[in-house]
Swiss-Prot record:
InterPro entries in the cross-refs: Aldolase_TIM, TAL/FSA, Transaldolase_3B, Transaldolase_3B/F6P_aldolase, Transaldolase_AS, TSA/FSA_arc/bac
Function in brief: Transaldolase is important for the balance of metabolites in the pentose-phosphate pathway.
Official protein name in the record: Probable transaldolase
Xref: Pfam families: TAL_FSA (PF00923)
Top-rank taxon, per record: Bacteria
Keywords noted in UniProt: Cytoplasm, Pentose shunt, Schiff base, Transferase
Catalytic activity: D-sedoheptulose 7-phosphate + D-glyceraldehyde 3-phosphate = D-erythrose 4-phosphate + beta-D-fructose 6-phosphate
Amino acid sequence: MKFFVDTADLAEIRDLAATGLLDGVTTNPSLVARTGRPFVDLVAEICDVVSGPVSAEVAATDAETMLKEGRHLARIAPNVAVKVPLTPAGLKVCRTLANEGTMVNVTLCFSAAQAILAAKAGAAFVSPFVGRLDDIGQTGLNLIAEIVEIYDRYPAFTTEVLVASIRNPTHVTESARLGAHVATMPPAVIRQLFAHPLTDKGLSQFVADWQKTGQNILEQAIPDRSGQDRA
């Protein structure tokens, strides 16, 4: 499973990219608005940090303007995935951009039927929102299972399931178990994946035991084993 971070905070992106665990970035108008930065400049900087797909969303809702914005965003860098809403206009733009060789992320997916439409429109990614479905009393992960099952039945569908609106580590692990291709999550959720009380407890014990030895690994010379190797 690929891990994307859902943020427009450049400092957070740099920090997580340094771990070597980050495969891409997703942004949306709300996240960008919080930064107060010019959108195109910000996306360009993110693309300099992350070599994987960087989703940049159009702001318009009509097909003509969305297409113009999508083409403009696609010129920023080869790894830009233009993000469009799952509407008739959005899917029309998706098909055109896909035919032109641009990656497209179709967002705001809330049903398996919508996911089928996104795949038929040539989307590189479809983004079903699990957390928002949970919020209205549905089980968002059930949608992931449906989409993965349908896509698996049709090898011609090359669209990747990009699980969005992730709220906790369980959303991540269950999405992986179901076979989703990508999980995009806020930085806080990525950091929660590292955490386990037994890891902390075990590390504290190892550190305490090592300190009792009074040793320093870096002060110890590597033994000369050249003679042994020849033997």
